[in-house]
Amino acid sequence: MDTEGFGELLQQAEQLAAETEGISELPHVERNLQEIQQAGERLRSRTLTRTSQETADVKASVLLGSRGLDISHISQRLESLSAATTFEPLEPVKDTDIQGFLKNEKDNALLSAIEESRKRTFGMAEEYHRESMLVEWEQVKQRILHTLLASGEDALDFTQESEPSYVSDVSPPGRSSLDSIEMAYARQIYIYNEKIVSGHLQPNLVDLCASVAELDDKSISDMWAMVKQMTDVVLTPATDALKSRSSVEVRMDFVKQALGYLEQSYKNYTLVTVFGNLHQAQLGGVPGTYQLVRSFLNIKLPAPSPGLQDGEVEGHPVWALIYYCMRCGDLLAASQVVSRAQHQLGEFKTWFQEYMNSKDRRLSPATENKLRLHYRRALRNNTDPYKRAVYCIIGRCDITDNQSEVADKTEDYLWLKLNQVCFDDDGTSSPQDRLTLSQFQKQLLEDYGESHFTVNQQPFLYFQVLFLTAQFEAAIAFLFRMERLRCHAVHVALVLFELKLLLKSSGQSAQLLSHEPGDPPCMRRLNFVRLLMLYTRKFESTDPREALQYFYFLRDEKDSQGENMFLRCVSELVIESREFDMILGKLENDGSRKPGVIDKFTSDTKPIINKVASVAENKGLFEEAAKLYDLAKNADKVLELMNKLLSPVVPQISAPQSNKERLKNMALSIAERYRAQGISANKFVDSTFYLLLDLITFFDEYHSGHIDRAFDIIDRLKLVPLNQESMEERVAAFRNFSDEIRHNLSEVLLATMNILFTQFKRLKGTSPSSATRPQRVIEDRDSQLRSQARALITFAGMIPYRTSGDTNARLVQMEVLMN
């Protein structure tokens, strides 16, 4: 049967194929088995999708129908809903429909107002959001910058370090966080401050810091020599450093000092070169710069170079001799060369004599214009680089030519450009012949920048470039970013600060290096306070004495709230290091104060100690604050804080070395000393303090089982009523008690009731009446104890203080047991 069925199916398929082949208009599509299977799967999935949709509709109907909802009605209602929005354009009206026109105009006005208000609201919200994001981002940038600067790595060094340790990184006691160089600097700062505090003449901080350079490498020695040279200027009288630094006289002095440093450095370089090659140098003749330069040229220019002009002097090119004599800072030696070759040099001798004899190395305007004209006509494309360089220096012209054939090193380039800097504007100089110090500073700091000078390989070179162009703040900020050089940057800043040459930021929230509105374009300000605090953060916890020496430089600085920065830093240092006794002094047993390190800096230590105590109090360090206020003889604050400390521990059981035992001993020591010396505080605070001490004694006796002594104490204190007659008086007196006393009321009532209940049980447990103790006495005592217990219950209900429900329940329970 199956065979016949398959045969019939095959026959039908062949017939269908034959019919299909007969239709020539249709294209033939041949598919393999895999393609046929895929086509079948697609047809099946369509069928399943329709089926699944119908199944889903059925399930939805069942689900919603069980809740009483008709899905067909819901579908109709949804389809009938209009999708038109409120702000859909209004329907047009006929021109003669006045009512419709007025209605449309009114609706249009309302919709326009709403839309305009919506746009304005969204615009304001977006603007506020943008401003908020900018402010928040600026704060985040500040925090990132501070974190990077305060870290132990270079600001941009993100290399993977060793795995972090989760053990406390606090250094062991006695171990310093300062390395040998930092410690050497700290000693010099100590010596400097000792002289200042003692009233001696102000020592030279540059010399003190430079002595540390002997322990380090040559770069540090050169750096301090440069700092000493650049700070040796006469400041003009001014109210602040900005006016002084902006004056023409001071800026001219800076350039003069920088040239002097570069010239002396180059002379030292020629000496080292000559004495390192004596055979080739052939040093001889009269000692001096001229002979030194001749010998140097024997090494530098051993053979005649092509393009050099105007002959030779003693076998060396004239202009090379003149240039190198000037480079060594010896114009007299250069004039000797000019005199020997005057016949080949034309008018140059006259110009050079005028240049050499002028006060500020500047030709007169007429001579300068004449020289510049000669240079432009005959020398601009001259083949002798030394001749062009000398003319550009003397005439201060052609500032765009860097003279790279001669000035091939950064120091030579600096020397050449500083020689071309001019300060007076006579109106005759063209832009290509005029270079101001501000222009040169901008070129080095902004146009070239760090990337040009490969600061990672030669950090001191970039520092030198900035420092010699009087950009002290930028130089310090750059050096400070490098961990190994940070200590040098800080001490350079201290030197400039003490010499009143440092431009400081007007606020402590400013970045480390900033430009403030109103300052000249190339002036930068250094956040000196932040610089010092970032530096001391490394060692203030392990070396508080050294940190204190640095903070002394901030004695005249104020923060944004007008608070003295020295006081603020000292208070933070004491709290951080917990070296209260060492820094602020210690109170002896007789009440006298043993001086601390702070006494070296000021004779009146009370404001500082009070400030530290206030900070400790605000941080919740009440015990330390109380000791500090005691040190400052502030009895009111001492007892006020002691009351806060004693109140929570009053009802606790005393144990050796417990918190209560320590505070009790401290309070007793203060009480004994105050009574012996007649020291009194505010009456209210004073009475609270002594009442708390009495309550501590009461609870100590109570916990020790001495209930009779404890009862005598509570009876004498008159804190709670023990009879109905004193009820009103005790309730009225309770209103005058401080919170420190009130917080202990529940425990006092429970302890007193326990004492009464214990006495009651003891009375009931005694033998029957005897001759010595008649029945009447026992009954009277029994009645008295019940009356006292009832008085406590009544008192607890009358006072304006909410005791806990557990306390009331226990009081009532014991009172009931006594009845």
From Swiss-Prot:
<feature type="modified residue" description="Phosphothreonine">
    <location>
        <position position="49"/>
    </location>
</feature>
<dbReference type="GO" id="GO:0034399">
    <property type="term" value="C:nuclear periphery"/>
</dbReference>
<feature type="modified residue" description="Phosphoserine">
    <location>
        <position position="75"/>
    </location>
</feature>
<dbReference type="GO" id="GO:0005813">
    <property type="term" value="C:centrosome"/>
</dbReference>
<dbReference type="GO" id="GO:0006998">
    <property type="term" value="P:nuclear envelope organization"/>
</dbReference>
<protein>
    <recommendedName>
        <fullName>Nuclear pore complex protein Nup93</fullName>
    </recommendedName>
</protein>
<dbReference type="InterPro" id="IPR007231">
    <property type="entry name" value="Nucleoporin_int_Nup93/Nic96"/>
</dbReference>
<keyword id="KW-0472">Membrane</keyword>
<feature type="modified residue" description="Phosphoserine">
    <location>
        <position position="72"/>
    </location>
</feature>
<keyword id="KW-0597">Phosphoprotein</keyword>
<keyword id="KW-0813">Transport</keyword>
<keyword id="KW-0539">Nucleus</keyword>
<dbReference type="GO" id="GO:0016973">
    <property type="term" value="P:poly(A)+ mRNA export from nucleus"/>
</dbReference>
<dbReference type="GO" id="GO:0006606">
    <property type="term" value="P:protein import into nucleus"/>
</dbReference>
<comment type="similarity">
    <text>Belongs to the nucleoporin interacting component (NIC) family.</text>
</comment>
<dbReference type="GO" id="GO:0031965">
    <property type="term" value="C:nuclear membrane"/>
</dbReference>
<dbReference type="GO" id="GO:0005635">
    <property type="term" value="C:nuclear envelope"/>
</dbReference>
<comment type="function">
    <text>Plays a role in the nuclear pore complex (NPC) assembly and/or maintenance. May anchor nucleoporins, but not NUP153 and TPR, to the NPC. During renal development, regulates podocyte migration and proliferation through SMAD4 signaling.</text>
</comment>
<feature type="modified residue" description="Phosphoserine">
    <location>
        <position position="767"/>
    </location>
</feature>
<feature type="modified residue" description="Phosphoserine">
    <location>
        <position position="430"/>
    </location>
</feature>
<keyword id="KW-0653">Protein transport</keyword>
<dbReference type="GO" id="GO:0005643">
    <property type="term" value="C:nuclear pore"/>
</dbReference>
<feature type="modified residue" description="Phosphoserine">
    <location>
        <position position="80"/>
    </location>
</feature>
<keyword id="KW-0811">Translocation</keyword>
<dbReference type="Pfam" id="PF04097">
    <property type="entry name" value="Nic96"/>
</dbReference>
<comment type="subunit">
    <text>Part of the nuclear pore complex (NPC). Component of the p62 complex, a complex composed of NUP62 and NUP54. Forms a complex with NUP35, NUP155, NUP205 and lamin B; the interaction with NUP35 is direct. Does not interact with TPR. Interacts with SMAD4 and IPO7; translocates SMAD4 to the nucleus through the NPC upon BMP7 stimulation resulting in activation of SMAD4 signaling.</text>
</comment>
<dbReference type="GO" id="GO:0060391">
    <property type="term" value="P:positive regulation of SMAD protein signal transduction"/>
</dbReference>
<feature type="modified residue" description="Phosphoserine">
    <location>
        <position position="52"/>
    </location>
</feature>
<feature type="modified residue" description="Phosphoserine">
    <location>
        <position position="66"/>
    </location>
</feature>
<dbReference type="GO" id="GO:0051292">
    <property type="term" value="P:nuclear pore complex assembly"/>
</dbReference>
<keyword id="KW-0906">Nuclear pore complex</keyword>
<keyword id="KW-0509">mRNA transport</keyword>
<dbReference type="GO" id="GO:0017056">
    <property type="term" value="F:structural constituent of nuclear pore"/>
</dbReference>
